Amino acid sequence: KMKNLPGGLVIIPLVIAVVLATFVPQVFQIGGYVTALFYEGNACMMGFFLIVCGSMIDIKQVGMPLYKGVIMTGTKFLLGVIVGLIVGKICGPQGFLGIAPFVLIAAITNSNGSLYISLSSQFGNATDTGAISILSLNDGPFFTLIALGATGLANIPIKSLIAVLVPLLIGFFWGNLDKGFRDACKTAQPIVTFFMTISIGAKTDVKTILTAGASGIVLGLISAATA
């Protein structure tokens, strides 16, 4: 089972998609539903994923889960902003080892909710798992866009922030008004993550990964260390 491997829900479909994109890329270009879902479906799946994340935010969740969620979310956000600003100040727009400051911010401020739930359920307690109600805000690009705009490293149009916020709010209000919807989203999250990861891997191949070189390895390690 994919759950037996930490992060397997992301790693396994990603590896499969990258291998297919490298050796038989035409499988994603059949057209129709296949191309729409497995190759062009990333934006749609991300919108769905944001609704799911929003539904996980429980306004009744107080105490230790709220405390842990706020601390982890705030720490990741501040760490990403500080690292991005320092690298930008010292190395300039070109960044460190070819890694631009805004890329570092995106890698550090974001998180993987599915991986967190998997690990916290296995090794943590109920309060650790409950913290996802706040940490899920970090799964999408919302905080990343705010960080990039706040640091001045990117000019983020207000429409982009609204486009991210709307599905989050839809999920938030619907999930708090209807517990059944939240439960359905909780079940759907791994499925959405699975297909979203495939569409990401379908646009990548082994040659791209290899040409990333040292900068790609460093970025991957930084992202993994701060996940």
Set out the residue ranges of the language-model regions.
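Cytoplasmic-side transmembrane-helix entry/capping segments in multi-pass membrane proteins
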Residues: L5-I12, M64-L78, T127-S136, I162, ...
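Interfacial loop-to-helix junctions that mark the boundaries of transmembrane helices
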Residues: M2-P6, F28-N42, V70-I71, P101-L104, ...
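Loop-centered beta-sheet repeat module
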Residues: D128-G175
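Short helical (or helix-break) motifs at transmembrane helix termini and adjacent helical loops
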Residues: T109-Q122, D128, A227
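Hydrophobic transmembrane alpha-helices of secondary-active transporters
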Residues: L14-Q26, T35-K68, P167-K179, T187-A212
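The feature identifies polytopic integral membrane transport proteins across all domains of life
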Residues: G32-A36, P65-G74, P93-I108, N125-I134, ...
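Transmembrane alpha-helix boundary signature
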Residues: F23-G31, M56-M64, V81-F102
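Entry/N-cap segments of selected transmembrane alpha helices
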Residues: A36-Y39, I57-G88, G140, T204-A227
